[in-house]
Amino acid sequence: MCGILFALAEDRDNLLESPSFSALRKRIRARGPDFFGKHKLNSGPWNLHFESSVLHLRGPSDHLTPQPHVDSFGNVLCWNGEIWQINHSDHHKFTLNRNENDGAKLFELLNNNPGDIEKILGSIQGPFAFVYYQVRTNTLWWGRDRLGRRSLLYSLRDSNFVLSSVGNSSDFREVEPGFHSVQVDLIPKINFSKSLMQLEKTNPLPPVDESFLMGSISSDTVDTLHTYLIKALQDRVLTIPKLCSSNLDCSHYSRVCVLYSGGVDCGVLARLMHDIVPNNESIDLINVAFENPRFTETYRDRETGLLPDNFDAYDVCPDRQTGLQGWQELISVCPARKWNFVAINVPYTEVCEAQEIVKTLIYPNDSVMDLSIGLAFYFASQGRGVLLQNVDDIKLKHQLPSYTIKAKVLISGLGADEQLGGYMRHLRAFERKGMAGLEEELQLDIDRIPHRNLGRDDRVMSNQGKEVRYPFLDERLMALFSKMKTTDKMRLDLVGGDKLILRELGRRLGCPLASQEKKRAIQFGSKAAKMTPGTGRTSGRKKLEVCI
């Protein structure tokens, strides 16, 4: 994961020396604490400034690849992404082993095929945002993958054009998923209300073996989901550099963690990770809970005004309760694994202190719900809590030492609800319009993910020097889901029929408790939402007052 900052300004402009740009650069550095690099070139009256920060996650663990990537001809690439595969038939020779840097390999491929930029970018499997300058045509390319899994914002003001992973003023807007190109001299004349070149939504996803896609949820169908999820996790986990020597006990050096509530999405992912992570490594389970004054008030005795003896504001959070339950289930199923339950407890005072920076990070998302979700991910990605390593620690949690995760990669279950009918709105659509209404609502959720979720979450969690990865948004897995009959994935006419195929997989993996948990949004499960008295009826869609 990296931070991208590009600026095009006239020669006489002092944009880069402005306090605003310096503040922006500081945020870019936070995204990539391992390295920060710059490159500058001129094109007529214009200065092109490329800046990148690097969180070292690809390539040899003892050799960081600097950015921006620059070659002897003057081509430049700022890359923030992960390439799992390039599908285009013209580039079938593109191979990437786990000791190679994907950005460097892509840069070489783009430079060696100057007429195939669109084809190459459109063939990438994996999350990405990028800025690429092609010196031969004086053309600037920029964009995000079709799902918008990495953030990229733009600002065009007073002939200054800025592309950045994060923003710090109301001038910034989100770059639409897809890729865009323009000759440098024409950039100040761009009308961004008109669409530039974009990745077509009809781009074929990877092929799927359709031989099993028949009938109801059969053993073969669940087994195939198992296979696809394992592959998605292998791509996202096994490429992470180890934090210790292979001949040492690595149980104290988790290189990966799961955003963990104890639900079926994260529960299945955690259980499958046990099958691919070496046995001598631990896995961190990140569980966040908030002190919520409004929720706490509901526990006070109406006559005395006192809280129950031994009341704990964090223990009553639903995600803490299901998280501990799911953690104990994992210990029972996989006793040889060291499962670190990282309990992150967030006092209300810390929430008040963090609100303004989180508002800035989530922008241009700007609703009450965005802030609640942003706060949950902000503190979760900081990874500072207490460490529970066995069931007996639950009784001793107030005596346990503090613990901060070392992992740079967070695994998220986002994408399961959107594709497998996990939201209440899916049930309502099914009740109103039947299967056609359900399928329409499912497609709307996929279409909205780039703007509603992914850019916002990337900006928040990357600010802590962390990268979030989404196995359920793996292109091959999404292709699998798109080929399956809706009734083979979910049965909303049945109680507990949402995400039915995933729940069945969870049961087979030995996690029946996690498999029966209902959907609960992180802002409600962690109690990050509606914290102050009188906000119980506040709509999550209400706009925030954001001053940036």
UniProtKB/Swiss-Prot annotation:
Keyword DNA-binding: no
Keyword Cytoplasm: yes
GO molecular function, one term: asparagine synthase (glutamine-hydrolyzing) activity
UniProt keywords, alphabetically: Amino-acid biosynthesis, Asparagine biosynthesis, Cytoplasm, Glutamine amidotransferase, Nucleus
Record domain Asparagine synthetase: where: 239-519
Source organism, top-level taxon: Eukaryota
Glutamine amidotransferase type-2 domain ranges (all copies): 2-193
A Pfam family hit: GATase_7
InterPro entries: Asn_synthase, Asn_synthetase_domain, GATase_2_dom, Ntn_hydrolases_N, Rossmann-like_a/b/a_fold
Main location: cytoplasm
Cellular component terms (Gene Ontology): cytosol; nucleus
One Gene Ontology term from the biological process aspect of the record: asparagine biosynthetic process
Subcellular location: Cytoplasm; Nucleus
Active site as annotated: 2
Entry protein name: Asparagine synthetase domain-containing protein C4F6.11c
Organism: Schizosaccharomyces pombe (strain 972 / ATCC 24843)
